């Protein structure tokens, strides 16, 4: 886990404070998604991403703060939206989600970030979450087509909010998206997203299987079973967990996949390493954390 430096922790608290104040008068059920966002390491990373990018792509402090706040507003809105889609919140919470989206889009708009960029990435996130919901099972079994839909591209679409803040930063810095630096940052971000997701999927495998939740990690394990059996077949959660427990080669394969993704991220960032030390730190920490993948025991 990445430990924040004192200045980073102070910045995080500064950006959070308006949303915490806004939530104080709201019902606890609405505050809960915000608390989940504020407790999440990934959202701290989202919020600090402009700070870490700024030595490479300079922006003024006021622009960085607005970009961070817009990102955090969007994260709270997305958490409420997902809870509504998941049935954890009723649709009575939807107006607040829309208000937060408007606030987020307004902040991005004050920075002249293109609305089309935001709308496209929002559509990708919603479609990916609906796709995830469609793979949940109450029978403990998955059809091949359900798991085959959970691709690496789906993982990145699910995390499109991370790309929002990075692409907005690139745009505000006056760099084109096809610039070699922008391409390298996008490549590194995709690889880091996939590495983090794979590690999370393996750590959460037992809970996910019990709850009937599919994931990219579940899909990769299923593919190992299908290769051994000559083709895709209906598969249940017990077989997924069982294969993980009895197949050390599979565990090593996923650990190697994680290591390769971290190497790809590092390779993309290395030409700019002197300017983005905290991004380099993040990839190194992720690489080190991935060493536990092959030894995770679900029992």
Could you say what each language-model-derived stretch is?
Residues 34-42, 91-97, 151-156, 250-254:
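Solvent-exposed loop and edge beta-strand segments that line ligand/cofactor-binding
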Residues 79-106, 166-177, 189-249:
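Acidic, Mg2+-coordinating active-site segments of isoprenoid diphosphate-utilizing enzymes
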Residues 1-80, 84-86, 117-124, 138-147, ...:
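Conserved N-terminal diphosphate/IPP-binding helix and adjacent helical/loop segment
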Residues 69-76, 104, 254-257, 261-264:
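Amphipathic alpha-helical protein-interaction segments
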Residues 109-127, 224-273:
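Primarily interfacial, aromatic-capped hydrophobic alpha-helices that serve as membrane anchors
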Residues 153-181, 266-299:
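C-terminal intrinsically disordered extensions
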Residues 91-94, 119-123, 183-186, 277-285:
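Short, charged, amphipathic alpha-helical segments
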Residues 14-23, 37-46, 68-70, 102-212:
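All-alpha helical catalytic cores of prenyl diphosphate-utilizing isoprenoid enzymes
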């Amino acid at each position: 886990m990445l430990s924040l430096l004192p200045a980073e922790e102070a910045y995080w608290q500064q950006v959070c404070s308006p949303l915490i104040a806004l939530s104080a008068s709201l019902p606890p059920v609405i505050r809960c998604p915000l608390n989940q966002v504020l407790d999440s390491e990934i959202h701290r990373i989202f919020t600090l991403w402009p700070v870490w990018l700024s030595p490479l792509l300079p922006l003024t402090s006021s622009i960085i703060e607005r970009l961070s706040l817009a990102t955090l507003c969007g994260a709270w809105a997305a958490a409420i939206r997902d809870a509504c889609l998941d049935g954890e919140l009723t649709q009575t919470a939807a107006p607040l989600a829309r208000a937060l989206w408007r606030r987020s889009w307004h902040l991005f708009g004050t920075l002249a970030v293109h609305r089309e960029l935001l709308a496209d990435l929002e559509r990708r996130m919603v479609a990916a979450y609906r796709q995830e919901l469609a793979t949940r099972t109450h029978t403990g079994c998955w059809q091949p087509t359900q798991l085959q839909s959970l691709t690496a591209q789906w993982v990145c679409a699910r995390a499109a909010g991370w790309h929002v803040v990075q692409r907005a930063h690139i745009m505000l810095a006056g760099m084109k998206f096809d610039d070699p630096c922008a391409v390298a940052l996008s490549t590194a971000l995709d690889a880091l997203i996939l590495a983090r997701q794979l590690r999370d999927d393996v750590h959460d495998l037992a809970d996910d299987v019990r709850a009937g939740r599919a994931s990219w990690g579940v899909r990769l394990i299923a593919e190992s079973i299908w290769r051994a059996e000559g083709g895709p077949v209906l598969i249940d959660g017990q077989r997924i967990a069982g294969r993980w427990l009895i197949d050390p080669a599979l565990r090593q394969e996923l650990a190697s996949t994680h290591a390769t993704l971290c190497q790809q991220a590092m390779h993309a960032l290395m030409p700019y390493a002197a300017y983005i030390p905290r991004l380099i730190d993040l990839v190194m920490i992720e690489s080190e954390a991935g060493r536990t993948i092959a030894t995770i025991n679900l029992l």
